Swiss-Prot record:
Residues 430-592 form the Helicase C-terminal domain. A motif (Beta-hairpin) lies at residues 91-114. The beta-hairpin motif is involved in DNA binding. The UvrABC repair system catalyzes the recognition and processing of DNA lesions. A damage recognition complex composed of 2 UvrA and 2 UvrB subunits scans DNA for abnormalities. Upon binding of the UvrA(2)B(2) complex to a putative damaged site, the DNA wraps around one UvrB monomer. DNA wrap is dependent on ATP binding by UvrB and probably causes local melting of the DNA helix, facilitating insertion of UvrB beta-hairpin between the DNA strands. Then UvrB probes one DNA strand for the presence of a lesion. This is UvrABC system protein B. It comes from Rickettsia akari (strain Hartford). Belongs to the UvrB family. It comes from the Bacteria. CDD domains: DEXHc_UvrB (cd17916), SF2_C_UvrB (cd18790). The gene is uvrB. InterPro entries: Helicase/UvrB_N (IPR006935), Helicase_ATP-bd (IPR014001), Helicase_C-like (IPR001650), P-loop_NTPase (IPR027417), UVR_dom (IPR001943), UVR_dom_sf (IPR036876), UvrB (IPR004807), UvrB_inter (IPR041471). Residues 621-656 form the UVR domain. Gene3D superfamilies: P-loop containing nucleotide triphosphate hydrolases, UVR domain.
């Protein structure tokens, strides 16, 4: 399919039709940068979706963290079910980069844990960009980090068509060059197996589909898509393209040229270190690099191969590395979501990476070429980005400068909801007053969000409210992601009534049940009480018709004054629109998606209980297969908390199956 097909029961409403028309007019007139100022609950994602459908251009949406990227991906996936909506974020569950601390002479080895499902989705994203046009890639800002060259990545593909001849040994060798592994016993993603006249391939971009190639001599007769779990045939294919199992696959002559380049740089660097009388650094660099060269010669790869990426891509020192932006077509469209946060992150990423690597190079742990394995500099990102729409409720200085201060506003909500009423109260007895406000709000069946300045204040206030028998919890950076999801679900379901946090605006909190947002010490100027932070926090109460905000302050700061003035301006515009069109504000009643549980076996169930639930091996194996498919499906839908529960249940059943056998 080459056209986007938006499927939704809703039509653009409020400010959305006007905003969509203005942005599209700007794109058609070749404006490079535009600013979409969308307040909380105004339907920014739906507006973006309509712009994408009408312009019919491949699109990249950048978000400032994985969580927000996942939310946008999920929404876009539901709006465009017939198109390629992809997810591209860092595939590390855990990442400790290599580093050297000179003052203590401590070297920290690189340590990481790769999430296979996210790696799969990254491959799916790059494949879609190279094969079709109806593509939306939702990415975190990590997409500006180096990636394999798109030219080499596409050059290394294996194209398969029935009726053509493929010498068996050459085909198997080509698959190995793509970093696929032969595994006739365990068939998993990135593997192939050979059975008689058939070759089965499990592509890197699939989790639940594989390809069976049926040969007569060297002639490929059929390509069947099948379920790798059950063996069931799903479809007959006219052609198939096998992409590399890594974005860093490359032909052997490229590897050989890279080895020569690395050896040449090594000799120059060793001579320089010797001239500086740095004998330890000389020995260290020679030993580490020679080992890497040996691994590259024998296997075509080595640990930390990305540090030599400049030699593989053929780029000169200082040139930008290939990134996801080089996979985009020339007429692509870019949305930068929450640009007031995303843009400063992009600016900061190069400098922090450079500072760490310069120490490694200086002390002989890496060659100077390792400095070119990096994220894009901000000015490079500026050069590479296509036509861009910045999206934020609180635009930053860069976006306003780029657009000449011209913004396209989304102020009218389709629901008719107004920006919340804001009240200033003295901070002297803020906790005492807060308790009475909590009492009144909770009595209405609504929830309360409270923001403090420090982690200790959040914990102390939570403990105090719990002593008073209020159902309270707190949220800050030390709370694990999955635990945070559970806390937010508990808040929406009423298991807890009050959530205390430090910087709640950064958590992406959208709680329709929220009736009160309390900002403690609102007059303490700083990052947490800046104009942008206050406007974002006030927005947390904008999804309920009874939403209110109390700012506890003993003096009127510039930030409070500007935040309240902007909120009042928006509220007046919304009121006038509602009166003119006879709209009554209506609270968003969004469904609460609870964590699903399986009745057949609990994750805490032991193997004896599993035996009683499934009295024979056949039943047990059937349920293991079913559970495994559900786990993979949950992971591919980014329902990681559900996938983790299914994984635990799967382990229990597998242990029971081993005992029965």
């Amino acid at each position: 399919m080459n056209h986007f097909s938006l499927i939704s029961e809703y039509k653009p409403a409020g400010d959305q039709p006007k905003a969509i028309d203005e942005i599209i007019a700007g794109l058609n007139s070749k404006k490079r940068s535009q600013m979409l100022l969308g307040i909380t609950g105004s339907g920014k994602t739906f507006t973006m979706a309509n712009i994408i459908e009408r312009t019919n251009r491949p699109t990249l949406i950048m978000a400032h963290n994985k969580t927000l990227a996942a939310q946008i991906y999920s929404e876009m996936k539901s709006i465009f079910p017939k198109n390629a909506v992809e997810y591209f974020v860092s595939y590390y569950d855990y990442y400790q980069p290599e580093a050297y601390i000179a003052r203590t002479d401590t070297f920290i080895e690189k340590d990481s844990s790769i999430n296979e499902h996210i790696d799969l989705m990254r491959h799916s994203a790059t494949r879609s960009l190279l094969e079709r046009r109806d593509v939306i890639v939702v990415a975190s800002v990590s997409c500006i980090y180096g990636l394999g060259s798109p030219d080499l990545y596409y050059q290394m593909t294996v194209n398969l068509e029935p009726g053509k001849s493929y010498p068996r040994d050459k085909l198997l060798n080509d698959l190995i060059n793509l970093q696929y592994k032969r595994n006739d016993m365990g068939f998993e993603r990135g593997c192939f197996r050979v059975k008689g006249d058939n070759i089965d391939i499990f592509p890197s971009h699939y989790s639940d589909k594989a390809w069976r190639l049926s040969f007569f001599s060297n002639e490929l007769e059929y390509i069947h898509e099948f379920d790798p779990l059950t063996g069931e045939k799903l479809a007959k294919l006219d052609k198939a393209i096998v992409f590399g199992h890594s974005h860093f696959v490359m032909p052997q002559d490229t590897v050989n040229n890279a080895i020569s380049g690395i050896e040449e740089e090594l000799q120059k660097r060793l001579e320089f270190l010797k001239s500086q009388n740095k004998l330890l650094e000389t020995q260290r660099l020679n030993q580490r690099t020679q080992y890497d060269l040996e691994m590259l010669t024998e296997t075509g790869s080595c640990k930390g191969v990305e540090n030599y990426s400049r030699f593989f891509t053929g780029r000169n020192a200082g040139e930008p590395p290939p990134t996801l932006f080089e996979y985009l077509p020339k007429d692509a469209l870019l949305f930068v979501d929450e640009s007031h946060v995303s843009v400063p992150q992009i600016k900061a990423m190069y400098n922090s990476d450079r500072a760490r690597k310069e120490v490694l190079v200086e002390h002989g742990f890496r060659l100077p070429s390792a400095l070119d394995n990096r994220p894009l500099k901000f000015e490079e990102w500026e050069k590479f980005r296509p036509q861009t729409v910045f999206v934020s409720a609180t635009p930053g200085p860069f976006e306003l400068e780029e657009t000449g201060g011209t913004v396209v506003e989304l102020i009218i909500r389709p629901t008719g909801l107004l920006d919340p009423e804001c009240i200033i109260k003295p901070a002297t007895k803020q906790v005492e007053d807060l308790i009475s406000e909590i009492q009144a709000t909770v009595a209405k069946g609504l929830r309360v969000l409270v923001t403090t300045l420090t982690k200790k204040m959040a914990e102390d206030l939570t403990a105090y409210l719990q002593e008073l028998k209020y159902k309270t919890s707190y949220l800050h950076s030390n709370v694990h992601t999955l635990e945070r999801i559970e806390i937010l679900q508990d808040l929406r379901q009423g298991t807890i009534d009050i959530l205390v946090g430090i910087n709640l605006l950064r958590e992406g909190l959208d709680i329709p049940e929220c009736g009160l947002v309390a900002i403690l010490d609102a007059d303490k100027e700083g990052f947490l009480r800046s104009e942008v932070s206050l406007i974002q926090t006030i927005g947390r109460a904008a999804r309920n018709s009874e939403g209110r905000v109390i700012l506890y302050a003993d003096k009127m700061t510039k930030s409070i004054d500007k935040a309240l003035s902007e909120t009042l301006r928006r509220r007046q515009i919304q009121q006038e629109y509602n009166e003119k069109h006879g709209i009554i504000p209506k609270t968003i009643n969004r469904a609460i998606h609870a964590l699903a549980t399986l009745e057949r076996v609990d994750s805490k169930c032991d193997t004896k209980q599993a035996h009683t639930l499934f009295d024979n091996t056949a039943k047990l194996k059937a349920n293991i297969n079913k559970l495994n498919k559900e786990m993979l499906k949950a992971a591919s839908n980014l329902e990681f908390e559900q996938a983790a529960k299914l994984r635990d249940q799967l382990k229990t059943l597998e242990a029971a199956a081993r005992e029965l056998s």
